[in-house]
């Protein structure tokens, strides 16, 4: 089940409202994988009264319907009209906060997202590949010249060829680029 949480990044005033779902038998003294889910443009909001928009798709939707996961799930809400790529520094500070306050296994932090969040997955992964065990972008677009930064981690991209918002060739281009440079990327 999702709970509503919030965090203000010190020194920046950046407010992150987020949904949090903990494992069924959660033990604060344990150690858990962390999955961060970045939503698409349609789920942006104010981080408080509009936070449930984040649970329209993917992992947070299933958690809100009662599905339990063996990992900690964090789903932050991006402000209206914004893009994840503009908030990488703030997201890193937010991740530092999560690691400091939750029993996160730092070797098992996974980043996923769809559409705008899929693009955010590529961009945050390109900027900070050393922080993630793997990236799972869904219908996102990355920056082709940044694939070199993702060679050290597995990337599994998902994209449907009927997507009218972002053409599937964006994902094909990223996955092929990573593999052409010796990386470990898969496309579904």
Question: For each of these PLM feature ranges, what is it?
Answer:
Residues 51-65, 94, 138-148, 169, ...:
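Alpha-helical scaffolding within the catalytic cores
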Residues 24-30, 79-116:
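Gly/Ser-rich "nucleophile elbow"/oxyanion-hole loop immediately N-terminal to the catalytic nucleophile
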Residues 1-34, 112-119, 124, 136, ...:
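A domain-start/cap signature at the N-terminus of enzymes
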Residues 151, 156-159, 163:
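Short beta-strand/loop motif that positions the catalytic acidic residue
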Residues 161-186:
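Active-site-adjacent alpha-helix of alpha/beta-hydrolase-fold enzymes
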Residues 100-101, 107-151:
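Primarily recognizes the serine-hydrolase "nucleophile elbow" in alpha/beta-hydrolase
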Residues 34, 38-92:
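Active-site machinery of serine-nucleophile hydrolases
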Residues 40-44, 78-83, 115-119, 140-144, ...:
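Solvent-exposed loop/turn segments at secondary-structure junctions
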């Amino acid at each position: 089940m999702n709970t509503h949480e919030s965090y203000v990044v010190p020194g920046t005033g950046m407010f992150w409202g987020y949904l949090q779902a903990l494992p069924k038998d959660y033990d604060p003294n344990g150690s858990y994988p962390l999955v961060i889910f970045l939503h698409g443009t349609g789920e942006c909001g104010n981080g408080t009264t509009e936070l449930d928009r984040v649970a329209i798709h993917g992992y947070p939707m299933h958690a809100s319907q009662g599905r339990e996961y063996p990992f900690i799930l964090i789903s932050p809400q991006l402000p209206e009209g914004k893009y994840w790529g503009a908030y990488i520094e703030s997201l890193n500070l937010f991740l530092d906060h999560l690691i400091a306050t939750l029993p996160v296994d730092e070797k098992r932090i996974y980043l996923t997202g769809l559409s705008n969040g899929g693009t955010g997955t590529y961009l945050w992964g390109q900027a900070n590949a050393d922080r993630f065990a793997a990236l799972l972008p869904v219908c996102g677009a990355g920056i082709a010249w940044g694939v070199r930064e993702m060679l050290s981690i597995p990337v599994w991209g998902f994209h449907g060829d009927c997507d009218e918002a972002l053409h599937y060739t964006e994902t094909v281009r990223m996955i092929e680029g990573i593999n052409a440079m010796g990386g470990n990327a898969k496309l579904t």
